[in-house]
Regions:
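Charge-lined substrate channels and their catalytic hotspots, especially those that engage the 3′ end
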Residues: 2-126, 135-181, 212-222, 227-244, ...
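Catalytic nucleotidyl-transfer cores of nucleotide-processing enzymes
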Residues: 167-172, 176-205
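Catalytic-core elements of nucleic-acid end-processing and repair enzymes
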Residues: 131
Length: 273
């Protein structure tokens, strides 16, 4: 596996900006950049206290790639919405649409790339973890692959995301949107009452998420609020919770650390402060 070389911003000649002022930028030629250009801060302008101004400043100062090349966008636009019968016959996928899956993420999550399901069995619980099959769309050395390698990751700013892949993939075909058939890779296994895993298999699949849930909803359900979840998914979520407790118990017995690390949250007022 080859990783893209890290990009380093040279800030040796960084100037000083007075308070309440924001630097603007212009493009200048640079032989080592991918497209022959780089952004360079050259002057300051009165600060407009709003989200757009702050995020444009962050994008410019960090040299983040905020636009996709035309050929990358064209490659993403070629993919059509999924036709389940075609996906099952052409790509030899296992049909898991009847197996109730849910996604569980934070309230502010902007992409949903994994879904889970579980059911009680004699030996314990059978669980399914399904992730979006990005490799189906992003082939090695393709324009999409090269752009993803160049970017390395999606960048999450407080109220927006600079995605690693173009929107037709990042926010649609590779996002496990409730009620939409999606190409996935599934890891299926049995977890016994001691938290041991067995009968593990990984295979290409087709799922259809039943609900987009949040950690807050699930925690409220665990705390006894029966109205926290849609009734249609409550039984499956209960099985997911019980299976996860078995896995967690075994991890702790093996010496795993359980760290409660607070996550920063950026809150803006209406003026963008």
């Amino acid at each position: 596996m080859r990783l893209a070389k890290p990009r380093v911003n040279n800030r040796k000649n960084r100037g000083t900006i007075k308070s309440n002022r924001s630097p603007s930028s212009k493009r200048s030629r640079h032989p080592r950049s991918r497209n022959g250009h780089r952004k360079k801060s050259v002057q300051s302008s009165s600060s407009r206290r709003n989200d757009r101004n702050h995020f444009e400043l962050a994008i410019n100062s960090l040299g983040l790639p905020d636009q996709f090349p035309k050929k990358t966008i064209a490659a993403a636009d070629r993919f059509k919405e999924i036709i389940p019968d075609d996906a099952l016959t052409q790509f030899e996928r296992r049909d898991l649409r009847s197996r109730l899956h849910v996604t569980i993420d934070g309230e502010d999550a902007k992409d949903f790339d994994d879904a889970v399901s579980a059911c009680k069995e004699k030996a314990g619980y059978r669980i399914w973890i399904s992730i979006a099959d990005v490799a189906h769309y992003v082939k090695a050395s393709s324009p999409l692959d090269k752009e993803a390698a160049f970017r390395g990751t999606s960048v999450y700013l407080p109220t927006c995301v600079i995605p690693m892949l173009p929107e037709p993939l990042a926010n649609n075909l590779c996002s496990l949107i409730p009620g939409q058939p999606r190409l996935t890779l599934t890891c299926e296994m049995i977890v016994d009452t001691n938290g041991n895993r067995s009968h593990i298999s990984i295979y290409p699949s087709l799922i259809q998420s039943a609900a987009r849930l949040t950690y807050t909803q699930v925690q409220s359900h665990m705390d006894g609020n029966q109205a926290a979840l849609p009734e249609s998914v409550a039984d499956t979520v209960n099985d997911i919770i019980l299976a996860s407790k078995l896995l967690r118990q075994q991890r702790l017995q093996k010496g795993s650390l359980d760290l409660e690390v607070p996550e920063p949250e950026v809150i803006f007022d209406k003026a963008g402060n």
